[in-house]
């Protein structure tokens, strides 16, 4: 079993640069459905999930994220996307059901695109677990 696993999109990749002790399974631009269809989750004591930023207009997002979360045995920290309110609501609902922790990147400085954290914000996120 892994100690720490970071999964998801480009935001997960950014966080992973500051947590070399964690296994990183992420891909720039991937949406939640494609992530679930592409990757197999190893067991981990802690899983950090950054998905939802690339899900705009995706049908069944809640079901995809709920099923993903249901496969995870250890504790979870969700990274709320800055740009997708539907994903934020779905993630908060799922996190509440499972008593997961949540980090809101809207509370940190974002880069000019309004989606990705700044370098300092990535560092701050990495220190939350």
Stretches found by the model and what they are:
Residues 1-46:
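Serine-esterase "nucleophile elbow" of acetyl-processing enzymes
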Residues 21, 34-129:
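Alpha-helical cap/lid subdomain in secreted, periplasmic
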């Amino acid at each position: 079993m892994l100690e720490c696993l970071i999964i998801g999109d480009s935001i997960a990749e950014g966080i992973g640069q500051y947590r070399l002790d964690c296994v990183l399974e992420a891909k720039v631009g991937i949406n939640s459905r494609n992530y679930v269809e592409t990757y197999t989750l190893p067991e981990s004591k802690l899983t950090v999930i950054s998905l939802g930023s690339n899900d705009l207009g995706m049908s069944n997002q809640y079901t995809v994220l709920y099923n993903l979360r249901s496969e995870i045995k250890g504790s979870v920290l969700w990274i709320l996307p800055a740009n997708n309110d539907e994903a934020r609501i779905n993630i908060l609902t799922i996190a509440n059901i499972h008593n997961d922790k949540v980090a809101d990147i809207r509370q940190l400085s974002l880069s000019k695109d309004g989606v990705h954290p700044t370098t300092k914000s990535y560092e701050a996120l990495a220190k939350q677990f």
